[in-house]
């Protein structure tokens, strides 16, 4: 975690070469220091934050006036800081009838913000202030500040479910973790109207950029675990599976069990779990297979690597198996030597400095907020199973000397359809997760996908892929923009890397050409815009038979003549 001084210093760095994001910050108290922290954190996380800050206490006026500076700025992200202190001040100035409506009035404004605001909205919820007017009886009094504040925070979560572009930054949770005295300095507040302490600002700005980064497609996908003294106490090779320290009884085993429960919940929400251990593989697997106190089982692990090779090389093996970026991986190990080895030799992997006491693991990891996400779909629950099935495909492929014969043996089937209310969440999520196979690196929210779905200027395609081993779910998305009566532009083409080298690219292009011919279009335009991660598709369009029409060696546009196109061979059947 950076200090505020480091964040302030970062704002002076040259960020012109970084991806630009326009961020509007509006608050009902002084927000200058918060603005500095957010901008600095953004730069240190490789974003060029162009930040517009509203004048003091102008939130409602800026949002409700369509001609305001806020709308002229056209932000990508709108950050709103309504402080608990100002809400308490308002509560103190009105009668009990109006006090009972305090939460509803604020919620009405938030809904208006969701309807009228620009881009994604990040809203800080409300840390608790116990005014002790009613004591504990406040929970029974509708007009009490405690009642209204609790209602407000609860209903904000319901609004976030109703509006896909509305995200809550959990300031109340941060305050609960660090304490009110850490978050707030009364002497500073009365003289400056600044609510948040200098010590709290780095944490809050980090959580804010966590949300932005997740929406932009930068988030952690995989947790790699050491075993001995990391997920259980003791060394299984020396102590045996029956003597490792784990279980719900008193003692250090309880800490390891609760840590495993945390990992299990991460797996259930879609984080890939891998093992990287210096052990004999058979011995390393015994606790998962035989110890009844273990929460984690082998079927929770997508990739299990246990040998006596160095862990840097083993993590590279895991990365190749999963085909994800190193920067989307987290490695946890109790051994400082192993942590430093991975930090030095595997650039990009996040390696937290675990405390010496396993009882402190979870509280420390809670502070890092490693696994921020901007979406969740049913497919996430099956991610570990999908990678385990992929291992079976790889094993089968090794028995074939002819790739075509292998692909035929998979019995692949794809369902092709446009966007609808059922697949919209997964389409939006895949846009946020896809980095390598993403021709223009376009990101979408559910609301944006829904808008495209109903716009006649676009044609939308979603592709699933199933085979003899199982269903990969929705794995490819294409959005065609109808530029004129003869020309289609591939606005968006992204695909899950899990299905590379299956012929899906040929199948999808055949589908696009069929659509173009059926609707009288003569040409399809494709564009490649380079990013830090999509170099693998730099030659995508030439490989498919497109001809370059403009651009240099990197960013370029290509055209495909629909009339002369010959259907490409693939071994995928349309469902």
Residue ranges, per PLM feature:
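Short, acidic loop-to-helix structural element flanking the phosphoryl-transfer center
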Residues: 248-273, 312
